[in-house]
UniProtKB/Swiss-Prot annotation:
Intracellular or extracellular location(s): Secreted
Name under which the protein is recorded: Disintegrin viperistatin
Similarity section: Belongs to the disintegrin family. Short disintegrin subfamily.
Subunit structure: Monomer.
Coiled-coil annotated residue ranges, if any: none
Chief location bin: secreted
Organism, as annotated: Daboia palaestinae
UniProt entry keywords in alphabetical sequence: Cell adhesion impairing toxin, Disulfide bond, Secreted, Toxin
Entry function: Potent and highly selective inhibitor of alpha-1/beta-1 (ITGA1/ITGB1) integrin binding to collagen I and IV. Is about 25-fold more potent than obtustatin inhibiting the binding of this integrin to collagen IV.
Assigned GO CC terms: extracellular region
Length: 41
């Protein structure tokens, strides 16, 4: 990957790394994508 909240220095961040946080919930990197997964609840 080159850009995205789950990408660092052209490498994927580890699964479980926080990529987006609000006062109510957090979203975590999957380790398989440079994008932050969107909660579908």
């Amino acid at each position: 990957c080159t850009t995205g909240p789950c990408c660092r220095q052209c490498k994927l961040k580890p699964a479980g790394t926080t990529c987006w946080k609000t006062s109510r919930t957090s979203h975590y990197c999957t380790g398989k994508s440079c994008d932050c997964p969107v909660y579908q609840g």
